[in-house]
């Protein structure tokens, strides 16, 4: 087995590796001695759905599962009630325990769309953090100083601006680091925004003398559909892993050619050599960028659905956009009495709020019965309407008298 080649794939797309030699030795020991190793990634269930941004880390872990890794998929049901302060300019609202548990349940069903179930352990950090107790918390907090905490850019900025920083937020990185002590992880993965917390795990493993120090693999934050901001549900630039095949396929096709290669690098399971060949073929005019994007959309859609559903999504997309046809699975709604268009867009699930709907109207992105609409105050009287936003969102609305 070519360990160097495997390590090159591990490093692919990574923002930073800490203790690369340890990662190499873990893989080598698996092939030479049959010893598995443990790779941890924590996810606070603060929202009900995972998106492709989350799957960047999952995809890398899935690759490592083929080379000896047992994934410790850690659901932060305890820390999720605090909220990770990383990159935040204000104290996060404390989440309700019931909502955290509901979100955690959906994570358990979604994660196996990427990871090998037989090589994955689902863990909840309440298991050990609930047992830590006051004495354990005091011992944990004694391992780190306030001065070190204030080295974090986000805390420093808030401190200088005299914005509140709760003691809970100081506790968060300590608790995340303690997770690595409890799990005895060999590697921890996370985004670049998690560096402080990930290094905390290494330090606490040393302090608690568990006989190992985890290596760290940091992945870049995946840009959303806009190609500028990180993928986020709040920015509405995301692709959810549970989205319908048609929507997933269409959204991937909407990204720019430049962003396409970023997605290939971080989300595709094609080898580095295969991706290099795709780039070369495009540069030499042997492959159209649109075809390369279609192939990427098919690959990702198939991973989260099935080959048949991915192919059907492609056929449906081609039918709609080449023939100016309407989606065959367009949702239908009925409303009693005339309705403000912005509200109708929300009622039909095409927008999340009337404010967002008005922005779409002012951006000339909304059509009613194939006619562009620019009047934000437009009302729909009795009749039947085809509502459309952009190229992907459609709904049929019947307004009754």
Swiss-Prot record:
Gene Ontology MF annotations: ATP binding; RNA binding; tyrosine-tRNA ligase activity
Enzymatic reactions: tRNA(Tyr) + L-tyrosine + ATP = L-tyrosyl-tRNA(Tyr) + AMP + diphosphate + H(+)
Listed PANTHER family: TYROSINE--TRNA LIGASE (PTHR11766:SF1), TYROSYL-TRNA SYNTHETASE (PTHR11766)
Domain S4 RNA-binding: 339-399
Gene3D superfamilies linked to this entry: HUPs, RNA-binding S4 domain, Tyrosyl-Transfer RNA Synthetase
NCBIfam families xrefs: tyrS
Superkingdom assignment: Bacteria
Location(s), subcellular: Cytoplasm
Main function: Catalyzes the attachment of tyrosine to tRNA(Tyr) in a two-step reaction: tyrosine is first activated by ATP to form Tyr-AMP and then transferred to the acceptor end of tRNA(Tyr).
Subunit comment: Homodimer.
Family to which the UniProt record says this protein belongs: Belongs to the class-I aminoacyl-tRNA synthetase family. TyrS type 2 subfamily.
Gene Ontology biological process terms from the UniProt entry: tyrosyl-tRNA aminoacylation
Motif 'HIGH' region mapped to chain: 45-54
Protein name as annotated: Tyrosine--tRNA ligase
InterPro entries, alphabetized: aa-tRNA-synth_I_CS (IPR001412), aa-tRNA-synth_Ic (IPR002305), Rossmann-like_a/b/a_fold (IPR014729), S4_RNA-bd (IPR002942), S4_RNA-bd_sf (IPR036986), SYY-like_C (IPR054608), Tyr-tRNA-ligase (IPR002307), Tyr-tRNA-ligase_bac-type (IPR024088)
């Amino acid at each position: 087995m070519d360990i160097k080649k495997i390590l090159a794939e591990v490093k692919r797309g990574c923002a930073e590796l800490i203790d690369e030699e340890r990662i190499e030795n873990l893989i080598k020991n698996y092939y030479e001695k049959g010893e598995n190793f443990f790779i941890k990634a924590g996810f606070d269930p603060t929202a009900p759905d995972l998106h492709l941004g989350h799957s960047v880390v999952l995809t890398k872990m899935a690759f490592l599962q083929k080379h000896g890794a047992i994934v410790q998929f850690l659901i932060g049901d305890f820390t999720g009630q605090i909220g990770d302060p990383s990159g935040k300019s204000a104290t996060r609202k404390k989440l309700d325990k019931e909502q955290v548990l509901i979100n955690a349940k959906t994570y358990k069903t979604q994660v196996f769309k990427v990871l090998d179930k037989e090589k994955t352990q689902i863990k909840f950090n309440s298991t050990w953090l609930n047992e830590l107790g006051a004495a354990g918390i005091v011992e944990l907090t004694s391992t780190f100083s306030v001065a070190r905490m204030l080295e974090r850019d986000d805390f420093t900025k808030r401190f200088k601006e005299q914005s509140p920083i709760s003691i809970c937020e100081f506790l968060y990185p300590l608790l995340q680091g303690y997770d690595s002590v409890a799990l005895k992880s060999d590697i921890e993965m996370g985004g670049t925004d998690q560096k402080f917390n990930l290094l905390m795990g290494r330090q606490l493993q040393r302090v608690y003398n568990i006989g190992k120090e985890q290596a760290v693999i940091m992945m870049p934050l995946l840009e959303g559909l806009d190609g500028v901001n990180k993928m986020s549900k709040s920015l509405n630039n995301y692709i959810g892993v549970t989205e319908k095949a048609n929507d997933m396929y269409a959204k991937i096709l909407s990204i720019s050619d430049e962003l396409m290669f970023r997605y290939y690098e971080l989300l595709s399971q094609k080898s580095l050599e295969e991706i290099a060949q795709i780039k070369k073929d495009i540069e030499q005019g042997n492959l159209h960028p649109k075809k390369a994007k279609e192939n990427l959309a098919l690959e990702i859609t198939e991973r989260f659905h099935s080959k048949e559903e991915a192919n059907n999504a492609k056929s449906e997309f081609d039918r709609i956009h080449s023939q100016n046809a309407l989606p065959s699975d367009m949702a239908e709604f009925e409303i009693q009495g005339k309705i403000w268009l912005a509200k109708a867009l929300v009622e039909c699930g095409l927008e999340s709020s009337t404010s967002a709907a008005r922005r779409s109207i002012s951006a000339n992105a909304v059509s009613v019965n194939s006619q562009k609409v620019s009047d934000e105050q437009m009302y729909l009287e009795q009749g039947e309407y085809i509502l459309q936003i952009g190229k992907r969102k459609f709904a049929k609305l019947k307004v009754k008298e």
